[in-house]
């Protein structure tokens, strides 16, 4: 089974920044035991400021500023909520 795109959205927020979410269904393997590959990114001023992904070999992790931190994946709805919550916190701290 090839990776099958199950969700893709790309929108600009009220500040002109980009929120992009992509989720693929993939075979469950050692690297993707939940059967999903994903990439969630918030781009502000042309730079990735927040990102969540499960790149092969790195597992579930998030990017905040220039740091890469582990992420405890539970499921796609929780991942989406965590990402959007972090984006909202960034916008509050940056734009008031």
Positions of PLM-derived features:
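The feature represents the first ordered module of a protein
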Residues: 1-61
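Short helix/strand-capping connector loops at secondary-structure junctions
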Residues: 58-71
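Short, compact, well-ordered microdomains
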Residues: 68-96
């Amino acid at each position: 089974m090839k990776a099958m795109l199950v969700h893709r959205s790309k929108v600009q927020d009220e500040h002109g920044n980009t929120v992009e979410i992509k989720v693929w269904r993939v075979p469950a393997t050692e690297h993707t035991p939940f059967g999903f590959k994903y990439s969630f990114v918030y781009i502000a001023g042309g730079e990735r400021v927040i990102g969540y992904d499960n790149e092969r070999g790195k597992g579930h992790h998030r990017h905040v500023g220039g740091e890469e931190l582990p992420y405890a994946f539970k499921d796609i709805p929780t991942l989406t909520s965590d990402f959007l919550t972090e984006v909202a916190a960034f916008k509050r701290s940056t734009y008031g």
